[in-house]
Amino acid sequence: MAVGKNKRLTKGGKKGAKKKVVDPFSKKDWYDVKAPAMFNIRNIGKTLVTRTQGTKIASDGLKGRVFEVSLADLQNDEVAFRKFKLITEDVQGKNCLTNFHGMDLTRDKMCSMVKKWQTMIEAHVDVKTTDGYLLRLFCVGFTKKRNNQIRKTSYAQHQQVRQIRKKMMEIMTREVQTNDLKEVVNKLIPDSIGKDIEKACQSIYPLHDVYVRKVKMLKKPKFELGKLMELHGEGGGAGKPSGDEAGTKVERADGYEPPVQESV
């Protein structure tokens, strides 16, 4: 047997040598996430994405990202049990411009409302806004004791439940069908739809804790940058200077020519 060096061991250098560890965060950039103008607090956080390399563009990795934000953080309100989903639709500079993508109630709020001795009434409906967004709205409500009621339970009859459900669907359809997405979101923030349902159903059976508990985005129209910029309060007069930036008109005599400068 020929005595010689094992070439396979010497080829790769020192056996068991460690690979050079590259920090993955050195290849990433931070982007600001901007909420639409309907909300009080516009800057909701930051997100990471790998820098543009060859054909892999950073902005493509950001588009379509969904952020779930509590209404407390969007409106600077301590008591808020609604969560809004915002989806990135465009990237401008280091800013991700988002649009409404859905809404939900927090789990603890939902569980705190479900109790014994009352009837829970739920309804859902698919509605299209005036600007072409197809939404599915889910509503929930609970029966409550009438004034001076002695009986412990407050159960509604099946016929009353059907009437209330019909009313819920009518009001949700009416409120969404006649408005665009921006106006619908403005109604969802204080939940004025739930309050309208509560008032309308008072004659059938008194209700309490009536909320639009969930909103799903089913279909969207074709993306338009102009509409997104309007949502972020930058549409229309985006190119016009405002306030101090606007210049003042200077009066010139007819046939005025500027003097020739000696050096530029």
UniProtKB/Swiss-Prot annotation:
Principal place of residence: cytoplasm
Biased composition (Basic and acidic residues): 242-255
GO molecular function ontology, one term from the record: structural constituent of ribosome
Keyword Nucleus listed: yes
Gene Ontology annotations for the cellular component aspect, listed alphabetically: cytosolic small ribosomal subunit; nucleolus; small-subunit processome
Keywords from the UniProt entry: Cytoplasm, Nucleus, Ribonucleoprotein, Ribosomal protein
Top-level division of the source organism's lineage: Eukaryota
GO biological process terms, semicolon-separated: ribosomal small subunit biogenesis; translation
Region (Disordered): 232-264
Family: Belongs to the eukaryotic ribosomal protein eS1 family.
Binding partners and assembly: Component of the small ribosomal subunit. Mature ribosomes consist of a small (40S) and a large (60S) subunit. The 40S subunit contains about 33 different proteins and 1 molecule of RNA (18S). The 60S subunit contains about 49 different proteins and 3 molecules of RNA (28S, 5.8S and 5S). Part of the small subunit (SSU) processome, composed of more than 70 proteins and the RNA chaperone small nucleolar RNA (snoRNA) U3.
Name the record gives this protein: Small ribosomal subunit protein eS1
Species whose genome carries this gene: Taeniopygia guttata
